[in-house]
């Protein structure tokens, strides 16, 4: 007897799925970008001390702390030390030409006269890392061949950004600026710069165009450390100078002018112990040496230094951890610090790729639908053995030879680009991008 066929079960869209007939409904936005403020939380910040420009001032003061400055110098140095290059959208000759143009405009590997210094972009990003947000105005000028080329990027410091203006959908529309113009008495107030004319760097953005300072988590440790240092200095002073004592006649009563004068003498000595003291004949002044030893404050300072370093993602020797490494899928062990550096390098590159590169490409290639991208590779290659480096040298030596077997040449060409770079194999596409720019990209006038 033939089995009766089962009726196919009707698929019912579950939570998070969508019926194919409703796919067109995904077009367009229904939810505007909203402010992340609730109760005492204003733009992700609950501490009034750190809200607005008052918070920026706190972060600026933190730069005078040795541990903070040391960590920032290390982070910024590692970010800059990577090998930065522009990767074309494809191996198409036009895409390679566009990438070479961007490479020349950004001044990568070229610090000659007439080139925009690549380090300026890092300087703007460093402000974003410290304060949460920073920007620069993109200024183009006409090149010798009629192309619009990068003249300069005018830094916009976070202290000069009064507010971000948004459109009706909650998207950023313009930056409102104010501040005194350097070299003159002019004061700019309420100047609006369209967002499309800027390159904006945001650190730790949650999607609402509100960055957060990398120093935010280090603030409690910095405040405690600063208060502790003041106590240590005060205690050390008392330990070295002694505790002042003033013996006055029994006839001097509390609340009298003589009593207030006695208090003033002791107070002045505490504030200025090197100054002389004039006393009435029957008054006696002395200092009492402290017999007990001062408490050891080094462990407390070390603890807060370690907390500052951890907040910045730095695994220094002050951070007493036994698990400062993390396993990744290729079997390497990458330190906490290196993971932090890579994350920041990607954050920097993403902003350049999103806010700057398209604005340099489209004025000169209006029909472009794909863009080159800024990317990087780490300077260190300690995880590769000498044998791997030797292999790369051998490949470079034989890959262009006519006598090389076809199978071996095909194998070399099939190597992933990341592996080719790791082995040190010369990348023809990258070399074409890095060729020195010719006179077509020179300026028709001097920069201001």
Curated annotation (Swiss-Prot):
Main location: virion
Record's keyword terms, sorted: Capsid protein, Viral capsid assembly, Viral genome packaging, Viral release from host cell, Virion
Region spans: Disordered: 1-25
Cellular compartments annotated: Virion
Taxonomic superkingdom: Viruses
GO cellular component terms, semicolon-separated: viral capsid
The protein's role, per its UniProt record: Forms the portal vertex of the capsid. This portal plays critical roles in head assembly, genome packaging, neck/tail attachment, and genome ejection. The portal protein multimerizes as a single ring-shaped homododecamer arranged around a central channel. Forms the portal vertex of the capsid. This portal plays critical roles in head assembly, genome packaging, neck/tail attachment, and genome ejection.
Entry's family note: Belongs to the P23virus portal protein family.
Complex formation: Homododecamer. Interacts with the capsid protein. Interacts with the terminase large subunit; this interaction allows the packaging of viral DNA.
Name of the protein described by the UniProt record: Portal protein
């Amino acid at each position: 007897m033939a089995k009766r066929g089962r009726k196919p079960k009707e698929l019912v869209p579950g939570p998070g799925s969508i019926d194919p007939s409703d796919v067109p409904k995904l077009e367009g936005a229904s939810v505007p970008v909203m402010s992340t403020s609730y109760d005492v939380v204003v733009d992700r910040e609950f501490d009034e001390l750190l809200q607005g420009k008052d918070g920026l001032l706190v972060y600026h003061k933190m730069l005078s702390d040795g541990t903070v400055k040391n960590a920032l110098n290390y982070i910024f140095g590692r970010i800059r030390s990577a090998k930065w290059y522009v990767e074309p959208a494809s191996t198409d000759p036009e895409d390679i030409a566009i990438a070479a143009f961007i490479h020349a405009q950004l001044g990568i590997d070229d610090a000659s006269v007439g080139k925009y210094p690549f380090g300026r972009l890092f300087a703007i990003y460093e402000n974003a890392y410290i304060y949460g947000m920073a920007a620069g105005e993109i200024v183009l000028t006409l090149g010798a061949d009629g192309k619009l080329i990068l003249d300069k990027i005018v830094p916009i410091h976070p202290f000069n950004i009064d507010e971000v203006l948004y459109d009706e959908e909650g998207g950023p529309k313009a930056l409102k600026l104010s501040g005194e113009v350097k070299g003159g008495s002019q004061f700019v107030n309420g100047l609006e710069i369209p967002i499309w004319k800027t390159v904006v760097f945001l650190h730790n953005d949650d999607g609402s165009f509100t960055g957060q300072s990398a120093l935010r988590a280090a603030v409690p440790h910095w405040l405690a450390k600063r208060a502790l240092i003041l106590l240590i200095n005060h205690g050390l002073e008392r330990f070295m100078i002694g505790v002042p004592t003033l013996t006055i006649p029994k006839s001097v009563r509390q609340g009298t002018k003589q009593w207030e004068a006695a208090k003033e003498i002791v107070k002045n000595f505490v504030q200025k112990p090197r100054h002389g003291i004039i006393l009435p004949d029957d008054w006696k002044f002395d200092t009492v040496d402290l017999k007990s030893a001062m408490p050891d404050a080094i462990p407390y300072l070390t603890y807060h230094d370690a907390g500052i370093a951890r907040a910045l993602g730095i695994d220094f020797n002050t951070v007493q951890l036994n698990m400062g490494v993390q396993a990744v899928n290729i079997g390497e062990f990458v330190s906490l610090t290196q993971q932090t550096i890579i994350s920041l390098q990607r954050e920097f590159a993403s902003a350049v790729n999103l806010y700057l590169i398209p604005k340099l490409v489209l004025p000169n290639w209006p029909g472009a639908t794909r863009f080159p991208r800024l990317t990087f590779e780490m300077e260190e290659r300690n995880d590769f053995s000498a044998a791997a480096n030797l292999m790369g040298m051998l490949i470079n030596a034989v890959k262009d030879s006519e006598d090389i077997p076809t199978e071996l040449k095909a194998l070399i060409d099939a190597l992933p680009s990341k592996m080719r770079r790791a082995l040190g194999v010369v990348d023809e596409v990258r070399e074409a991008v890095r060729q020195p720019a010719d006179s077509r990209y020179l300026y028709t006038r001097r920069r201001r």
